[in-house]
Amino acid sequence: MDGWSEVLRIPSSVFATDNYNNPTTIVNITSLQFDSVQNFIWCGDSRGYTRSFTGSFATNSLYGNLQLYPYTKFHTSDVNYNNPIKQILSHREGILSLSNNAISFNSRRGLSKLQVTSKTFNNNATTENKFNNLQAMTFNCNSFNDVVVGTDTSMMKFDLNKPNVLSSFDHQGGISLLNNLGKFLTIANSNGSLDIFDPVSNSTMKTFSAHNGFISNLDVRGNYIATCGYSIKPKRYYHNQPAEYIVDPLVNIYDTRIMRAIAPVPFPAGAASVKFHPKLPNIIIIASTSGQMQFVDIFDQTNVYLYQADLAIPTTTTTTINNKPRMSNLEISENGDFLVFNDNCDNMHLWSISPSSKDFVNFPQPVEQPDIIDSNFEIIDIDANVPLSIVGMPYYKELLLSNYPNDLRFVKETAKLPEPIDIELILENETRNNGTKKFFPYDKLKYGPGNVYKPYQSLKDNKENKEISIPKFISERSTTTTTTTKELKADNDGKFIDDSIFQYKFQGKLNKVPNCYSRLQIQYSKFGIKDFDFSYYNKTKECCGLENHTDNSYINSLLQLYRFQSSIYNQVVGSLSKEWLPNDITTIITTNNPEGSSILNELGYLFDMMFKAQSNNVKIYNLSQVLNHHPNAQKLLNNNELLNLNSQQVRDLVIEFNNFLLTTLHQDFQTQFQENFNLTELKYEIEIKGNGTSCPMYDKHQGSMFSLELITPPSNMLNKMSILINNNNNNNNPQYQPEPISSLDNIRRNLNILTYLEYSMNQYKTIPCQQHNHSYPHNLEIQTSIVHLPSVLTINVNLSNPEFKIINNFTQWLVPEFYAVKSKSISGKNGYSFKEIDHPTPNSATQESGKYKYKYELLGYVCEINHQSDIVSGAHNLVAFIKVNNNGGWYLFNDFLVMPIPEEEVFDLQPSWKKPIVIMYQQTNQPSFNYLTTTTTTTTTTTTFSNAGKYDDSILYRDHFAEGIRKGHQLEYELLTRKESPQPGSLVAIDAEFVMLKPEELEIHYDGYKKLIKPKQLSLARISVLRENGIPFIDDYIVHTSDIYDYLTNFSGIEPNDLNLTLSNRENLVTLQTAYRKLWLLLNLGVIFVGHGLYNDFRTINLQVPERQIRDTAVIYYKSDFKRQLSLKFLAYVMLKEKVQSGNHDSIEDANTALLLYKKYQNLYNKEDFESILNYIYSEGQQLRFKVPE
């Protein structure tokens, strides 16, 4: 740090105000700041002005002395005040200036982008009092748009992109300085203490007592914090003596990794300012008010460089407060080459360690200069008297195009015929490919449809016999034609189907991942998600797919596995028969459960919706929201479809979630219904024994767990067990000849998962005894055994990559069925042994029923698919193989792709990209599914909901507001009575309103083309349900505690704070589960829902309603020839002669209008006049442009 010197001083006369009557008036410098983007020094003064200086070398100097030139000056304080500028922050798009009651955001040219005052925010009436007496500001952690502001009473933040919302932090007390680290905010309190604050958890992580008086300066770099300040001088005479402050001779250093102070740096002159060097974080720059500066190494405090600044001595004409020179506002540039500060005569001093440099940042952007118009531009007038040669021509070294010879001919290169292919290559290729002419394999999914010869095909034949079905938008089915190639497969009806996505195996290519395991993406057209052809990916009739454009969608495959386990399905869905609707403020606010639900409840609703959806797709949004708010699931959240995780991290996440799910289901059953969820519970026993009589140590413990962690046996044990299996299988064969053992790979090929299970369920180890080691050293024997197997055995396979490679060598590691034998070992220990059923027969269980007690079969497993190397992030996805039918039908579930798959593909684990993670075996005597249906069926495996009688539907007949019943509330609806109990076929009108939680994600190309990546995320805000006579019986507003991006007031009628539990004027606020349970009960009771645009409503609510229970007026009054659906407002004007939705939307009004339109349709349909009326509606719409006249 040797070589620093003063290179420039700007006198105080530069900062004089533009007042011609008193030109000697001095403006005090209150803040300084180096720019982080361009070569600027920013200066704030006491009159509320911010100005900038830019550096340049003098043109008339031989050595290029640095000069600072004024660039801009503009007023940044509140327009009604001239408050001093307390702090300046550099932003990539401009400059932030802090005054007493305003924050101004200006471009570097001085143009105002934004001015934030107390009137900017629309939170509530108390905001005006909060956003005053501003003291400090900084950017939020890892964000340049969130600005954190500290006042003399609190701390707040706002977004530069949306500055109308002011959020408060949970921090009390006055703030003098603010700064930010990578994850935390550093707060200098007015009482001299230092707080380490976490903005994510909204809490103070650590508080240090830094200085007795106050902190004068604060700086951070890396993991270190440096502070300097003042202490209160002890009172010597009487207690009412005014407080006096003395500067502390130490600079405090704090390490945020260990959250404590380290060795301070002494500075006898009194530290008033401290800064970290930006390039050498171990170097700090300490300055006193008298101008003494030291460069000190905090790890080697003997390494000190001392400098003294030449400060101007104030005179009585400039100040009358202090006649001593005083230094303030020390700042260092981003590249560490310049220092700037000012004295109390308002002179600005610039120091540098590199006199030949003029850059304040490493890579500065060019400074925008004003346009200079050349006033001496001459215009040449050409008329008949002036020759054209006066204009002049440049000198050309080559001939111009206009000077080409007459015999020159131009030949177009593309007009040449291509060179013929060598006949020898064609003959060689035909010989190699058995006569087929194929040079290179063509990947259609990668490169798109090939440019091949198209044979003639008449339009008539194409429509009637050769219709092509490929994955495309539904709106393009009738207009898009596609070439029929060899990759298109014809079905029994003569139609061609592109089945490349359903390809599950490449012949002879084990390392290439087939198409059916690829990561799928939902495409969005201008018609939205409804236009995407989900039916192409799922041609089954009973298995639904799950969408993957939802947070935590990585659990889709695991949820599919549990949904097809009948015992788990019956118990989880059966729990919905009892009502559990917490609505107290402790649940909603304190425990952060605004949905008023649980993992058990949402999983029950989801399972029921997955059954009712049949082959339609389902979202897991409601379950994901509860998961996001669950306190024990914060480490399990993933909202980017595993793009940030490698192979091992994906396995860890899925297995951890599996354990969390089973444990949470058990806890929810005990909390809600005082029941146990023991379908997957394994009971184990731990026995500790000493060494005979010399060590009488003995202990036994018992416990339980809900899943088994699979452990790979040691290599020597695998070797030994393989030999035993060979002997047992071939002792009775006289022609058997033992083969020599050449390698471990050859030995392991006859092992399977049962070997791993026996080793994992019977663990044995020894540890040194610590209680009797005074006599002689000996060991304790610890044996862990599984003593009880559940009816559903869930196995977590969290193995390393080398261990998975061992499994890849097995011919069939998974077994379809096995017997579990409960027996005692030689030592009398209870345990289990397993035997594979090589050739199961119908009477195999009865023949050996005395020996084998439990018979298990494979239900399915969750499999990780590696598309690239294991260490690559974002190249892995999850699928599930599940045995759906009792007759042995296997299906592959890859999000919304559902397809049958052969059994040999399920048990083939030889490809290295295929790794089982969660395996589920179940006992063969599982009960049948108890599905809830709304109609009487002839099968014995379904239950009619209306006849069940055990489901609690009392919520339909009472109010259940959040925070309890509100007395005196004037209801806009009348509750149902038991006499009005909904029956199958009853008409109810419904309408819902929504708010936006997240905006849509767009991909914008350079040419302006926009592609929708993810749609906007909506949340239910209000639901209204009406009787058939138009009288409402449900009108609920849904509580929201998370941030709402847009209330969509013009469409929803929801005003800000309407959904806030503490600030809302609405009395009928309920939790999301309360409203959802009402709709779920109505759905299962078999009512018919009438509404307008019900597809989007039910999709957002996550309710799967059969088509036979929907009467959608948007579909009823739709004529396919026009390809335009009519709005409810226009239909009401034409059909009912009424004007609705004149102001904000009202869900009761909209539901009643849809009900009247449906009744109108019934009357017209019975009179057989509906088609003519529909034509009249569209003709009127064309004349009015489908808009209601004002």
Curated annotation (Swiss-Prot):
Catalytic activity: Exonucleolytic cleavage of poly(A) to 5'-AMP
GO terms for biological process, alphabetical: mRNA processing; nuclear-transcribed mRNA poly(A) tail shortening
EC main group: hydrolase
WD repeat windows: 24-63, 129-166, 167-207, 222-264, 266-306, 322-361
Domain of life where this protein originates: Eukaryota
Single GO molecular function: nucleic acid binding
Residue ranges occupied by any USP domain in the UniProt entry: 512-924
Cofactor dependence: a divalent metal cation
Cofactor binding summary note: Binds 2 metal cations per subunit in the catalytic exonuclease domain.
Written domain comment of the UniProt record: Contains a pseudo-UCH domain. This ubiquitin C-terminal hydrolase (UCH)-like or ubiquitin specific protease (USP)-like domain is predicted to be catalytically inactive because it lacks the active site catalytic triad characteristic of thiol proteases, with residues at the equivalent structural positions that are incompatible with catalysis, and it cannot bind ubiquitin. It functions as a structural scaffold for intra- and intermolecular interactions in the complex.
Complexes and interactors: Forms a heterotrimer with an asymmetric homodimer of the regulatory subunit PAN3 to form the poly(A)-nuclease (PAN) deadenylation complex.
Protein name listed in UniProt: PAN2-PAN3 deadenylation complex catalytic subunit PAN2
